[in-house]
Amino acid sequence: MTLTNYVQEVSLADFGKPFHHKAYWNKRLKTTGGRFFPKDGHLDFNPRMLEEHGELIFRKIVRHELCHYHLYFEGRGYHHKDRDFKDLLAQVNGLRYVPTSSKSKTNHHYSCQTCGQVYQRKRRINLAKYVCGNCHGKLMEKNQS
């Protein structure tokens, strides 16, 4: 079954309305489960949400995007802030927020040589340029494990 067929099935089963456009996987999505494009009506979905959280959570993400889709084409409020959107999302039991990833987001660990303050960062920092925020001591990179 293709992604578009799956979205069509969810739309008919949960909303009672057809889905007339295309649905695509988008590997570039990092922090969101999916996106709706009002200009041409297609939906993008993050494949990692299905891999990491399973079909039950992914179906709720599809419901969320279909709420945007159906409300837009009905001419009603389709933004997150709109009451129509919140009501329809609650009615179909969709997710309001995407679950956080189970993977650790901190890759680099630093500690102050003077006071021992520990810092965790996603990106590397220039140890010659930055110092401890507490005591202005020198930072050193800890071994990653």
UniProtKB/Swiss-Prot annotation:
It comes from Streptococcus pyogenes serotype M3 (strain ATCC BAA-595 / MGAS315). The keyword Chaperone does not apply. The keyword Protease does not apply. It holds the Pfam family SprT-like. Its main location: cytoplasm. Belongs to the SprT family. Keywords: Cytoplasm, Metal-binding, Zinc. This is Protein SprT-like. Binds 1 zinc ion. Residues 4-140 form the SprT-like domain. The lineage of its organism: Bacteria, Bacillati, Bacillota, Bacilli, Lactobacillales.
